[in-house]
Amino acid sequence: MNLFIQMFRFAAEPFFFQRAQNKGSKQLYAIVMEFFTAFCGLILLGVFLYLDVFALIIGKDFRSGMGVVPIMLLSYMLLGMLFNVSMWYKLSGKTNMAIWITLAGLVVTTLVNVIFMPKFSFWAAAFGHLASYLVMFIISAVLGAKYYPIPYSWKRIGALFVLIGAVCGLSMLMDNMMFAGVNAGSSPASAVVVKLLLHTVLLAVYFAGCAFLLKGRYKMALATEE
């Protein structure tokens, strides 16, 4: 997830600046945000639904911390979305605002770690990152709407998050009801294969949901370039 975000960042920043003066640039930025969210959701689910396989790769000594992986993935997803919405202060020349937004995130991270880490250990650090990026994202989005309004479709983005949450929830419900105790490496191969196949079906459902939610948006993005 972090690798994809860094790749996107290096490619997107010149892309945004190059089109800043175009008539349909703001609409294009909004559509880019939607596809970015959908692709990050794919990465998140690609790891979450096949977490058993990744657990085999990293070894037994580190499996106790696998539970925080989805939290960290969501955190990095928010970080990437923060990069998208924070382009406003670069495009509007208000880069000094970045300092205050970053400080707000630092305060949240510090407070969560100081208060909760003694009791919850690395879980506090994971949720501290999540809370920090969420606060920074909200602040940046609110300020961006004031100083450099971009017509983000928050309903569509929210629907993508609901879709991601629904797929995660269905997979956990299915695992508890049908595959309790089934794990790669310690269970019969047939049970693991069936479990992973059903998870693949859920991933296909996510694809279908994204196709429905983003229908026509790619053509609209191309139209802004004309």
Where do the model's predicted regions map?
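Membrane-embedded alpha-helical segments of multi-pass transporters/permeases
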Residues: 3, 44-52, 71, 110, ...
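Short helix-capping/hinge motifs at transmembrane helix termini and TM-loop junctions
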Residues: 50-52, 58-63, 93, 116-120, ...
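Helix-loop junctions and terminal segments of transmembrane helices
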Residues: 1-34, 86-91
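Hydrophobic alpha-helical transmembrane segments of multipass membrane transporters and ion channels
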Residues: 34-42, 74, 78, 163-167
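Short runs within selected transmembrane alpha-helices of multi-pass transporters and secretion channels
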Residues: 6-9, 67-117, 122-146, 199-204
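Membrane-interface helix-boundary motifs at transmembrane edges
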Residues: 22-24, 92-94, 145-155
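Transmembrane alpha-helical segments of multi-pass transport proteins
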Residues: 105-108, 155-221
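Interfacial segments at transmembrane-helix termini and the short loops linking adjacent helices
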Residues: 30, 47-77, 83, 182-190
